[in-house]
Amino acid sequence: MSSVQSSQTQKNDDAEVFDALIVGAGFNGIYQLHRLRQEGFKVRLFEAGADMGGIWYWNCYPGARVDSHIPIYEFSIEELWRDWNWTERFPAWDELRRYFHYVDKKLDLSRDIRFGMRVSAAEFDEARDQWVIRTTDGTVVRARFFILCTGFASKPYIPNYKGLESFAGESFHTGLWPQEGASFTGKRVGVVGTGASGVQVVQEASKDAAHLTVFQRTPILALPMQQRKLDVETQQRMKADYPEIFRIRRETFGGFDILRDERSALEVPPEERCALYEKLWQKGGFHYWIGGFSDILTNEEANRTMYDFWRDKTRARIKNPALADKLAPMEPPHPFGVKRPSLEQWYYEAFNQDNVSLVDVREMPIVEIVPEGVLTSDGLVELDMLVLATGFDAVTGGLTQIDIHGTGGITLKEKWTEGARTYLGFATSGFPNMLFLYGPQSPSGFCNGPTCAEMQGEWVVDCLKHMRENNKGRIEATAQAEEEWAQLLNSIAGMTLFPRADSWYMGANIPGKPRQLLNFPGVPIYMDQCNTAAAKDYEGFVLD
């Protein structure tokens, strides 16, 4: 610890002390708060937003909705699901907010949450084995354990476009949408980016905008959502199966209740293969992505069969052949499914409308933003509203944006300059008593949020209970365990097609960010590794 840091730490001897300070009030954070309180720990949660919900507080743009179906995208706690009913198979942001309010009321969470508290810095007090945590408003607290539940999409990425601040119209990033809303009606709207939020904004803006221009770099291989309304009677009948559904989601690759076909796509006759693809297509959601054959994400030839089926189904919906070549090209831009597919309802049909146009920025790059709109190499696109659907500094950005100092004064950002280094996707050496959930080198982006919140969350709760029962005040991952974890992750990644795409899974969407697989492929294998380490007295950690 530096002398300046040590002096600052000593000045906060009178700060309130907690067993655990949690950052973030999404699924992970509130599950941790609930469970640690149940086990008798003194806990406080800091949330930067004015309400709970995590990403569903910040993502309130028109059309924003979850891509995991119901009942997978909710807690498995019977006290919660027994009396709650959804209105849609894939709920929108406002219904998800109502769900979080319901959870809050049921579990009495808000009394231990402080909203509007953005954590700006934290340093480890080696003399006391405590973290000293600071917020932007000057609040300082101490905690034995610093638990970061910032999610994988909490730091919006805004490209460094020349002249961006000069734009005279309205300009918003989808992850920072104004809480009071913004209207597309009668406006010339430009959307930069065609990931999940871009797809959803395009669908909504296409209905009301005077003209909509979509700036696309790489075509999104979007899947049909197959959205539908849900009634109370149907859900009440379904609830008899909820315990089994929640059991299954703990045992599948992505934490869903979707089982894959264990055969190779190449050993199945073409007619039978297409029949399965059609069945998955009609089910909607992620069924087509993760319910197919066992080698779709590991064998390029097998993968191509899935892309070709997707391409043919999608091109049939696009009237203009030239647009079809841009949106669903004959040759895949990357292997199917190695970028997280977005779910759509009428995305491709939107491009059949006279008020919607597409700009391929690989052919006509954005030169700069000017007061009147977007200047490309082909000329000016005049706009009244510019929407940046440009994603996030995913998985690591929410952690490294906090000025976190570990032992010896090194910051987390400095340590991860050449790439994230963790053990079990929970901890990193040099930062004792700091644990993160849904973060780097855990399933995170591959996993349904509530599934990970509960499975990772229980591991953390058990770890803290173990330390309390054995009078241990400090836990730290070893550098050797980190290295072995990286080797395991790299070996698994090398067996897949994921490194073949420039995706946020690989950190490739952020200029200068080290390229590495940021997510552990598969919940069951991951949890087996975590539980094995715990059973061996937390092998790979040093407990004092």
Curated annotation (Swiss-Prot):
Binding site for FAD: 27, 47, 56, 67, 73, 119
Cofactor: FAD
Domain of life: Bacteria
Biotechnology: This enzyme offers a promising route for the synthesis of chiral enol-lactones, when expressed in an engineered strain deprived of enone reductase activity.
Keywords linked to the UniProt accession: FAD, Flavoprotein, Monooxygenase, NADP, Oxidoreductase
This enzyme's EC code(s): 1.14.13.-
Molecular functions (GO terms): flavin adenine dinucleotide binding; N,N-dimethylaniline monooxygenase activity; NADP binding
Site label Transition state stabilizer, positions: 340
Pfam families: FMO-like
Top enzyme category: oxidoreductase
Record family assignment: Belongs to the FAD-binding monooxygenase family.
Function: Catalyzes a Baeyer-Villiger oxidation reaction, i.e. the insertion of an oxygen atom into a carbon-carbon bond adjacent to a carbonyl, which converts ketones to esters or lactones using NADPH as an electron donor. Besides cycloalkanones, can use cyclic alpha,beta-unsaturated ketones as substrates, leading to enol-lactones. Can also act on methylated cycloalkanones and methylated cycloalkenones with high enantioselectivity in some cases.
Miscellaneous information on this protein: Displays a different regioselectivity from O.batsensis BVMO.
Stated name of the protein: Baeyer-Villiger monooxygenase
Taxonomic source organism: Parvibaculum lavamentivorans (strain DS-1 / DSM 13023 / NCIMB 13966)
